[in-house]
Amino acid sequence: SVGFKAGVKEYKLTYYTPEYETKDTDILAAFRVTPQPGVPPEEAGAAVAAESSTGTWTTVWTDGLTSLDRYKGRCYHIEPVPGEADQYICYVAYPLDLFEEGSVTNMFTSIVGNVFGFKALRALRLEDLRIPPAYIKTFQGPPHGIQVERDKLNKYGRPLLGCTIKPKLGLSAKNYGRAVYECLRGGLDFTKDDENVNSQPFMRWRDRFLFCAEALYKAQAETGEIKGHYLNATAGTCEEMIKRAVFARELGVPIVMHDYLTGGFTANTSLAHYCRDNGLLLHIHRAMHAVIDRQKNHGIHFRVLAKALRMSGGDHIHSGTVVGKLEGERDITLGFVDLLRDDFIEKDRSRGIYFTQDWVSLPGVIPVASGGIHVWHMPALTEIFGDDSVLQFGGGTLGHPWGNAPGAVANRVALEACVKARNEGRDLAAEGNTIIREASKWSLELAAACEVWKEIKFEFAAVDTLDR
């Protein structure tokens, strides 16, 4: 007779363990589970734990060759989602041994691999992860972090200002460099390659890098401030990406850029290691994130992608604006902004934070607010994001009626006015418009910007909201 009982058995017999006490070394996950009709939540939660760890659809005799108790994921708690008929938050604990050290790629392949196509579930979303210090210690994390970046740039006590060069595609390298120069000369700290500017027929990467470096040095000489342009090193292969980063370093520029979701975590971590070894800051763009994170009942929440980026490595990451043209509810956004910047974050469900997270010694990441923002938003942005942020105005700089440099001047004047008002103890939320109006009296550039954008608002309800 065979030494094991063949056949299909319910997942919950093995993988649903409500009595389990989580360990300090476990990776904990909170999944929003929508089971198919007729599937009980315990079975659905156990199925998630099984399929994302050691389980398969039937009993196999090789299970007897290892200790499932030691290696299996466990669904240890289930709670119904308030206001939703058939959604549950299922908490799963994974033993640390299931994951390769220092590999975000491997962590995601396990936790959000096959399980998302699982038939017993109508939908599945990974809401949050608790990464234990034991695992965090296997990652280098951001190449430099917030304090080192401020020291490199010699800029303190205020948010940094950026601008994405538009039109994003179609400019020649020389005209592109000209726009970079004008913006930096006008008072911005950074300009930025758009995420889809890589190396296209109208502007090859090497030409762009050269003209942007020239613009950078010229603007630095004229303003006496350190300037940066995020040179997008994203490429079709890792080797090509590193080649571009090497060239950027040879030009002596301070910062490069990567599209971390389309480029992939393996490429991103390689680039982050190169950047730390060679003194380059690394700006991260999140192109493709909304494909993954925008639906409320399926996918991965951005706070998880943000945590993953902090582990993989990046000094800046785009994180929504709360006030512009792109998705982002205030409390949720501030929740993952804190996850990016702070060393220790308490569990706080009102901001979507399911677990207390201790980052031990991993440097912080600066959140970048970008997308449909302009001078009238400056008080709100200063109030919401605080000093450790980059505020990025693309159209809000280049769309100025007098041109790029005056657009940059308007933004810098508005920012300095808001920081000054805040430092004097004024309430930016209540007096924001007044502060901007006062400042525009002694800056014609700001007055012109105020006139152009006084009516623009992007008023749509957020799709991804807190559960009430």
Swiss-Prot record:
N6-carboxylysine modifications at: K192
Active-site residues per Swiss-Prot or TrEMBL entry: K166 (proton acceptor), H285 (proton acceptor)
Entry's Gene Ontology cellular component terms: chloroplast
Modified residues (N6,N6,N6-trimethyllysine): K5
Keyword Disulfide bond among record annotations: yes
Site (Transition state stabilizer): K325
Database matches in Pfam families: RuBisCO_large, RuBisCO_large_N
Source domain of life: Eukaryota
Keyword DNA repair carried by entry: no
GO biological process, one term: photorespiration
CC cofactor note: Binds 1 Mg(2+) ion per subunit.
Recorded catalytic activity of this chain's protein: 2 (2R)-3-phosphoglycerate + 2 H(+) = D-ribulose 1,5-bisphosphate + CO2 + H2O; D-ribulose 1,5-bisphosphate + O2 = 2-phosphoglycolate + (2R)-3-phosphoglycerate + 2 H(+)
A molecular-function term among this protein's GO annotations: monooxygenase activity
Cofactor: Mg(2+)
Residues that, per the record, bind Mg(2+): K192, D194, E195
Binding site for substrate: N114, T164, K168, R286, H318, S370
Subunit structure as annotated in this protein's UniProt entry: Heterohexadecamer of 8 large chains and 8 small chains; disulfide-linked. The disulfide link is formed within the large subunit homodimers.
Function: RuBisCO catalyzes two reactions: the carboxylation of D-ribulose 1,5-bisphosphate, the primary event in carbon dioxide fixation, as well as the oxidative fragmentation of the pentose substrate in the photorespiration process. Both reactions occur simultaneously and in competition at the same active site.
Name listed for the protein in its UniProt record: Ribulose bisphosphate carboxylase large chain
Taxonomy of the source species: Eukaryota, Viridiplantae, Streptophyta, Embryophyta, Tracheophyta
